[in-house]
């Protein structure tokens, strides 16, 4: 669950939110609507933790799937790795494991730590991570031959599809998606609808595509 308690936010003299309290429940799919400038994206950033409220609190689950809006942030990584990075706990374990394996000599402490890391990788389905990531990429029309390329080699529209796959990866407890259908063709939108309609966590979506929202949302919140 995501819980918002007595949250207030203003920019200069403009009050965006005043003592807002609400909750978002697992199994429900929420669409945020409202005119440009109403504060939808700001509210989403408060939910993700990208912004802190000036007053009040937001309580969120540990595993969040958030659609990044920075298409250059992962340019040095392979496409498949950028998706797997959506599960931060798994990615941190994989990186640390690789560092230990690269050592010329391992200590007893390294061996013990490797055992802990293998446990994390197993808990987070790390042994099927590349397969799971590839399925998401295929659903969003990123062909197999692009999965090993660097993100920097992709055009902007395809980068945003990869970042959407990143948000969906790793069984997040909550999905927070700001305009997820941007850069998607009709087949990919249809695939995304099916995916989200089967998702069992908390889903919060901002979209100007009311037809898309009507196809996935159980609740609409107007800001």
Question: Which residues are covered by each model-predicted region?
Answer:
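ABC ATP-binding cassette signature C-motif
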Residues: 1-223
């Amino acid at each position: 669950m995501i819980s918002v308690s007595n949250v207030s936010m203003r920019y200069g003299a403009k009050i965006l939110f005043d003592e807002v309290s609400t909750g978002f429940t697992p199994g429900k799919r929420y669409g945020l609507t409202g005119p440009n400038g109403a504060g939808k994206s700001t509210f989403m950033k408060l939910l993700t933790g990208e912004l802190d409220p000036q007053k009040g609190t937001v309580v969120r689950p540990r595993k969040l799937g958030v659609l990044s809006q920075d298409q250059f942030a992962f340019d040095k990584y392979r496409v498949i790795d950028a998706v797997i990075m959506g599960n931060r706990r798994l990615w941190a374990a994989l990186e640390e494991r690789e560092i230990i394996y690269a050592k010329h000599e391992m200590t007893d402490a390294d061996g013990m730590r490797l055992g802990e890391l293998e446990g994390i990788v197993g808990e987070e389905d790390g042994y099927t991570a590349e397969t799971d990531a590839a399925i998401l990429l295929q659903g969003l029309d990123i062909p197999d031959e692009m999965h090993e390329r660097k993100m920097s080699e992709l055009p902007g529209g395809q980068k945003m599809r990869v970042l959407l796959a990143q948000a969906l990866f790793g069984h997040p407890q909550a999905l927070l998606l700001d305009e997820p259908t941007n850069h998607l063709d009709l087949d990919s939108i249809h695939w995304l609808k099916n995916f989200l309609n089967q998702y069992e966590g908390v889903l919060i979506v901002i979209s100007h595509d009311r037809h898309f929202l009507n196809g996935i949302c159980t609740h609409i919140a107007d800001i």
